[in-house]
Amino acid sequence: MRVRYTRDWGWSDSSQPYEVADFELSKYFSLGSTDKFRQRVIAADFWTADALSWDESSIQDGQKVYHRPPGYLGANLGGLFRMRAYPTSRFNDQAVVYYSLEYRLIPEWNPFADIDWIKKHLDIEWWQLTAFAELGRVSPDWNISDMHTSMKWDAGLGLRVLAKGMVARIDIAGCPEGYGVSMMVGQPFMF
């Protein structure tokens, strides 16, 4: 669980102060092992955020400047971590709600274990197959009923490997607007 408050005070070279509050909860449910899979897990994630200063503004050099956070800190969906079928920050507004569910399987069989070059240079300890679905919505204000209407969704498959102590992943996801492929180091949930 993470509760975070981020504020830019507008000091130094900052052109606009902003405030963002967000909450994220990730939970993992072990389904145990089988003859073919050494680990089976259902991973769930919930995230919500509100750009508290979204409607505030000031006049700078004769221009009205809104106190909104940069895209990577605000209430946005799309990209490497949330709503992976959509482009980065495809949806951006004052508030957001997001849900994700992943089914993760680590097979007993490791095809990389017997390849000397891979074993020596990459040391792939395990590989993982995933199936996932995501649901989310941005909104002009943090209103629980508004944020749960006309929600966007996507679903996809992923392949992850633990190489040299780091998780590398490739995910492909589809949505009503098309599909997206993402490659990244680390699992999609922040914790």
Name each model feature, range by range:
Residues 55, 102-110, 116, 120-155:
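Outer-membrane beta-barrel transmembrane domain signature
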Residues 1-122:
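C-terminal outer-membrane beta-barrel translocator/porin domains of Gram-negative envelope proteins
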Residues 1-10, 83-88, 131-136, 166-176:
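Transmembrane beta-strand segments that form the barrel wall of outer-membrane beta-barrel proteins
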